[in-house]
């Protein structure tokens, strides 16, 4: 009778490359594409078709000799708000899972950043393509403007892309920072956070009013233009992203 001796192989202690760890977090965040992709596109499509149908009915009721201005609809703005919600849900739900699967806090923050950039670029490109079709068809044949505004109607496509990209990144960073506060300090942290935010907003508006600086603010916005003013949002985006990292690096997954 012979016996077989089994020798256990030592476990590899070589750490995974950073890119691999980041990709793992990104795959985790995209695990349910309905949340970040399918649902917002479905809602956007339904809202667009409803607006187009309503505007077509209104236009059909105008006499042939009547005039009708191009309608500008803000329905597409819901997409930016929805991405803020996606950011909040992603951080709240995926952060403890990522740590449970062996990812570090840095891996999660970097992975979330890649996740946000991918969605921001993708949705910005979609809005640009839709706006180009909208222009080419004269507002979908009925003078209806859903994917663009009067300010961007004459702008170059890359300006619309840059503006959308900046807006998406801003909303993602705000959502991540807000969610990180809840992850670390729960309800009490949210009370303090929103209280401080309201206080800062009212205080800032009061300061500008006391200095009679509103005309200067308006002049600056007019001078910078839509895209130039939006570029300043990068400061807020960077601050929120940094805040999310500083908060999450000390956060735990326990209640």
Describe each PLM feature range:
Residues 71-91:
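Long, hydrophobic alpha-helical segments
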Residues 86-97, 166-189, 239-250:
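Transmembrane alpha-helical segments in integral membrane proteins
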Residues 91-117:
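Helix-loop-helix units of permease transmembrane domains in multi-pass membrane transporters
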